[in-house]
């Protein structure tokens, strides 16, 4: 509070959409301009109801699965990414699809496939049911990747079951929470293969740092 008892609102910077989301929205907008409505999008292009409603008014139809779309239609995959199975289904239904997956999510996909090709079992730190996690896990056979959500999941791992292992993460996680899980996992597997650069994207990291920087002078967030 200041002397006049007025509330002060601090806005973190940076804030708002990341480059990957803006790219995905732009792909949808350009598709509308080029082909006209309807344009189908598998899952919400971004978790923002205002953006979704605005695009719906322009003729975008958001669906949960490809089975909700007539064969042969145009469809866009959201920034969160999709499994290899979804792309195969789109091809079998003769759909003209555009992949708007964030390039930083694709980086994690490539890591998963490379580790699998090299014979490593993969541990993915992320949230069960999140579209990005579903897409990443769907890049390789199910028995080659294990999802870890918390410390209990890591404590339950039988390290003697695995020879060579690798670590990847969801791109949109708490930096601090993920660091704790990684350290715990490295105690079990000192030689675990880590990403050359962390998988949590720079936009996620920057925005968390921005909130931390103003939190010290705020009474409430």
Residue ranges and their predicted role:
Residues 1-221:
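The feature marks the mature, well-folded catalytic cores of soluble enzymes
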